[in-house]
Amino acid sequence: MAIVDLITSGLGLLASEKDITPTWVEGVMRGSGNLEDGVTVTAVSTERIGEGVGILSILQRVIPTYSGATKAPKTFVVKYPTDDPVQRGTADALVFYIRELTFYRDCAPSAPFKTAKCYGQAIESENTNFTIVMEDISHYRPLNQLDGVSLSDAKIMLEKLADFHAMWWNSPKLPAMQNIFPPILNPTYEMVLPMLWAQGWPNVEKYAGHLLPDSVRGIGDIWGGKVPWMLGTLMEPMTLIHGDYRADNMMFDGDEPVVIDYQICGTGSGIYDVGYFISQSITTDVRRGHDRELVNLYLDRLETHGITIDRDEMWRQYLVVIVFCVNYGVTTFGGFAEQNERGQQLLQEMLLRALYCVADNDALKVIS
């Protein structure tokens, strides 16, 4: 199956659902080898999915009508830049979109977990307008960010994450990959993240201040100044990290894990993905008391790949990660008032999970 270049093919990128025409869909399906000669696309309908969850792209399901019998997919998914100005600004500043396109083209075929098939993609070189056309995998069992992940599912996802990290662990290929998948310590993050934090924290205090654990209230004043040190701490051992390893990007095909959304891929310590996943994708009541167990499960799996682990250093890094990853909840609070009800619930829940994870593990001590 070919992956259609949407620019060189002349089909063009999507700016809104109005651009998803029968001609465009037919070009993608035929160019990717999924539509037979003599069969055409006569109509299309769309439905938006994942609206309001505070992420960085628009996702729409496309339902084509074909002129006759075909092996072409009955539905597929398109992804293009968000229309939320706060989220788009974040994505542009941190150069997220090209990472996912590169991952699907170069890395997905060898990844240890399933990903959606890619039918077409492209990004404009002079800006961050992009489009990805992907397999619709909505029939798989999804995990849910708001409900949280069970311990049993979390253990499966952490073991599979270790398999993923092991593929690139201290790989000599990583330096050449860093022009697309930047190191976690880089000038852009050092400059942008403190600014985004400063913009988001006042909204945290306004909308969720009464909910914050007392022991971590001081994080608002100290986090921004610690960004270079935290990121530097998380540079080694180096591997390819997913960057957004959370429940809404995970599902199961039977017993087989499926992972999507590679916009935030980078290079750094694999414990980054571990801390982000545990601190924000598992509810506080389920996670509490299991942090070390889950971290050790991940490390045990790494060792099965012949990787030597300094467990004390990995635990120290875990504490740094869970402090650092509070930023996901804080920076997205800049657009809290504009979110729908689920979006607001998700932003608030992710923030509080992260903060309670910090409080439960007394993690602020590592950056104080």
Segments and roles (model prediction):
Residues 2-44:
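Juxta-kinase regulatory segment immediately upstream of eukaryotic protein kinase catalytic domains
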Residues 4-5, 254-258, 272-279:
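Short acidic (Asp/Glu) and glycine-rich catalytic loops that position anionic groups and cofactors
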Residues 46-196, 270-271, 311:
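Conserved ATP-binding subdomain of kinase catalytic cores across diverse folds
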Residues 51-69, 77, 224-270:
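Active-site acidic catalytic loop and adjacent metal/ATP-binding pocket
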Residues 98, 102-118, 209-222, 226-242, ...:
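N-terminal low-complexity, intrinsically disordered segments
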Residues 102, 264, 270-306, 322-343:
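Active-site activation/catalytic loop segments of kinase-like enzymes and analogous catalytic loops
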Residues 140-242, 343-368:
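ATP-dependent phospho-/nucleotidyl transfer catalytic cores
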Residues 155, 300-368:
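Helix-rich C-terminal or lid/interface subdomains of diverse kinases
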